[in-house]
Amino acid sequence: MTYLLDVSVLVAWGWSDHVDHERTAAWIGAAKRRKATTLMTSAIPELGFVRVSVQRTGGRVTVAEATETLAGMVAALGARHVLLADDRAARQFPEWCSSALRTTDAHLLELAAAHGATLATLDTGIPGAFLLPTKVANGG
Protein backbone atom coordinates (compact mmCIF):
# COMPACT_ATOMS: atom_id res chain seq x y z
CA MET A 1 0.00 0.00 0.00
CA THR A 2 1.18 3.51 -0.74
CA TYR A 3 0.16 6.46 1.44
CA LEU A 4 0.64 10.20 1.07
CA LEU A 5 1.00 11.61 4.60
CA ASP A 6 -0.94 14.82 5.15
CA VAL A 7 -0.07 17.71 7.46
CA SER A 8 -2.07 16.33 10.40
CA VAL A 9 -0.14 13.05 10.32
CA LEU A 10 3.23 14.77 10.07
CA VAL A 11 2.51 17.20 12.92
CA ALA A 12 1.18 14.48 15.22
CA TRP A 13 4.12 12.21 14.46
CA GLY A 14 6.72 14.95 14.74
CA TRP A 15 5.84 16.32 18.17
CA SER A 16 5.58 14.06 21.22
CA ASP A 17 3.30 16.56 23.00
CA HIS A 18 0.62 16.23 20.29
CA VAL A 19 -2.56 14.47 21.44
CA ASP A 20 -2.32 11.98 18.53
CA HIS A 21 1.45 11.40 18.67
CA GLU A 22 1.32 7.85 20.05
CA ARG A 23 -1.46 6.85 17.65
CA THR A 24 0.44 8.22 14.67
CA ALA A 25 3.84 6.87 15.72
CA ALA A 26 2.32 3.41 16.21
CA TRP A 27 0.69 3.47 12.77
CA ILE A 28 3.87 4.67 11.04
CA GLY A 29 5.91 2.04 12.89
CA ALA A 30 3.50 -0.69 11.78
CA ALA A 31 3.48 0.63 8.21
CA LYS A 32 7.28 0.59 8.09
CA ARG A 33 7.26 -3.08 9.14
CA ARG A 34 4.97 -4.06 6.25
CA LYS A 35 7.09 -5.01 3.26
CA ALA A 36 4.96 -3.52 0.51
CA THR A 37 4.29 -0.13 2.12
CA THR A 38 5.50 3.20 0.78
CA LEU A 39 5.07 6.40 2.81
CA MET A 40 5.10 9.55 0.71
CA THR A 41 5.38 13.21 1.49
CA SER A 42 5.08 16.13 -0.88
CA ALA A 43 5.89 19.81 -0.69
CA ILE A 44 2.47 20.92 0.58
CA PRO A 45 2.37 18.64 3.66
CA GLU A 46 6.04 19.33 4.38
CA LEU A 47 5.48 23.10 4.22
CA GLY A 48 2.37 22.67 6.34
CA PHE A 49 4.39 20.77 8.94
CA VAL A 50 6.89 23.62 9.22
CA ARG A 51 4.16 26.29 9.38
CA VAL A 52 2.00 24.48 11.95
CA SER A 53 5.03 23.50 14.04
CA VAL A 54 6.05 27.14 14.42
CA GLN A 55 2.49 28.43 14.90
CA ARG A 56 1.41 25.84 17.47
CA THR A 57 4.28 26.82 19.76
CA GLY A 58 3.91 30.56 19.38
CA GLY A 59 7.34 30.67 17.77
CA ARG A 60 9.16 28.67 20.44
CA VAL A 61 9.97 26.22 17.64
CA THR A 62 11.79 28.07 14.87
CA VAL A 63 11.53 27.41 11.15
CA ALA A 64 15.04 25.94 11.28
CA GLU A 65 14.11 23.62 14.17
CA ALA A 66 10.91 22.48 12.46
CA THR A 67 12.83 21.84 9.24
CA GLU A 68 15.46 19.85 11.13
CA THR A 69 12.74 17.79 12.83
CA LEU A 70 11.09 17.12 9.47
CA ALA A 71 14.41 16.02 7.98
CA GLY A 72 14.85 13.56 10.85
CA MET A 73 11.34 12.21 10.35
CA VAL A 74 11.91 11.65 6.64
CA ALA A 75 15.26 10.00 7.38
CA ALA A 76 13.53 7.69 9.88
CA LEU A 77 11.25 6.46 7.09
CA GLY A 78 14.32 5.26 5.21
CA ALA A 79 13.71 3.32 2.02
CA ARG A 80 9.94 3.42 2.67
CA HIS A 81 9.88 7.17 1.88
CA VAL A 82 9.24 8.78 -1.49
CA LEU A 83 9.04 12.54 -2.06
CA LEU A 84 6.11 12.95 -4.44
CA ALA A 85 6.42 15.79 -6.93
CA ASP A 86 3.22 17.80 -7.07
CA ASP A 87 2.25 17.81 -10.73
CA ARG A 88 -1.44 18.63 -10.32
CA ALA A 89 -3.10 21.95 -11.12
CA ALA A 90 -5.38 23.51 -8.51
CA ARG A 91 -8.23 24.53 -10.78
CA GLN A 92 -10.84 21.84 -10.19
CA PHE A 93 -12.25 20.52 -6.95
CA PRO A 94 -14.66 17.70 -6.14
CA GLU A 95 -18.22 18.46 -5.11
CA TRP A 96 -17.54 17.75 -1.41
CA CYS A 97 -14.98 20.57 -1.37
CA SER A 98 -17.34 23.44 -0.68
CA SER A 99 -15.16 25.68 1.49
CA ALA A 100 -11.71 27.20 1.24
CA LEU A 101 -10.69 25.18 4.30
CA ARG A 102 -10.97 21.93 2.31
CA THR A 103 -9.10 22.93 -0.86
CA THR A 104 -5.74 21.59 0.29
CA ASP A 105 -7.35 18.32 1.43
CA ALA A 106 -9.04 17.94 -1.96
CA HIS A 107 -5.82 18.72 -3.81
CA LEU A 108 -3.77 16.22 -1.80
CA LEU A 109 -6.45 13.54 -2.18
CA GLU A 110 -6.33 13.96 -5.96
CA LEU A 111 -2.52 14.09 -6.00
CA ALA A 112 -2.35 10.84 -4.06
CA ALA A 113 -4.90 9.11 -6.27
CA ALA A 114 -3.15 10.25 -9.45
CA HIS A 115 -0.02 8.44 -8.25
CA GLY A 116 -1.68 5.26 -7.00
CA ALA A 117 -1.57 6.32 -3.36
CA THR A 118 -4.10 6.94 -0.61
CA LEU A 119 -4.11 10.12 1.47
CA ALA A 120 -3.42 9.21 5.12
CA THR A 121 -4.90 11.67 7.60
CA LEU A 122 -6.21 12.31 11.09
CA ASP A 123 -8.92 14.57 9.65
CA THR A 124 -12.45 13.25 9.34
CA GLY A 125 -14.60 14.29 6.42
CA ILE A 126 -12.21 13.68 3.53
CA PRO A 127 -14.04 11.19 1.29
CA GLY A 128 -11.69 8.48 0.07
CA ALA A 129 -8.88 9.28 2.51
CA PHE A 130 -7.51 6.75 4.98
CA LEU A 131 -8.23 7.81 8.56
CA LEU A 132 -5.49 6.52 10.84
CA PRO A 133 -6.90 3.96 13.27
CA THR A 134 -7.17 4.83 16.93
CA LYS A 135 -5.57 1.50 17.83
CA VAL A 136 -2.96 -0.28 15.76
CA ALA A 137 -3.11 -4.08 15.78
CA ASN A 138 0.09 -6.06 16.20
CA GLY A 139 1.89 -6.06 12.89
CA GLY A 140 -0.16 -3.15 11.58
Predicted feature locations:
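Short, well-structured N-terminal submotif of metal-dependent ribonuclease cores
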Residues: 1-41, 56-68, 137-140
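Hydrophobic helix-cap positions at the C-terminus of alpha-helices
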Residues: 30-31, 73, 111, 136
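Alpha-helix/helix-capping structural signal
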Residues: 8-9, 44, 124-125
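Active-site regions of enzymes building and remodeling cell-envelope glycoconjugates
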Residues: 128-140
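Active-site neighborhoods of divalent-metal-dependent phosphate/nucleic-acid chemistry enzymes
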Residues: 76-124
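Residues that scaffold the ATP/ADP-binding catalytic core of kinase and kinase-like folds
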Residues: 12-14, 52, 129
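Short, conserved alpha-helical segments within structured domains
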Residues: 41-46, 104
